[in-house]
Amino acid sequence: MALEFTDANFQQVVMESDKLSVIDFWAEWCGPCRAIGPVIEELATQYEGKVNIGKVNVDVNPNLSMNFGITSIPAILFVKGGQVVDKQIGAVPKAVLDKKIQAHL
């Protein structure tokens, strides 16, 4: 199951982690966000224990969105060692995200 990243836990769970983190910035009112939601859940199950995969609701956690300059959603950031190493804007097939994850493991 995908994690829920928030303003409160993001620093510890993502930025201070040695693992790759995949963060899906989304909102309930966003159609493409809802479309990619099941893909994020599948990847979270597939990479459980190896990669931190989770979601940030931009309406509930606006500080994270501002800090990362998120202006379009869904936006998926790949963070490793406290740095953004890749990103994907818009809904894409699972294979695209899987390839990006593999590239940064």
Question: What would you call each of these model-derived segments?
Answer:
Residues 55:
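Conserved residues in the N-terminal Rossmann fold of short-chain dehydrogenase/reductase
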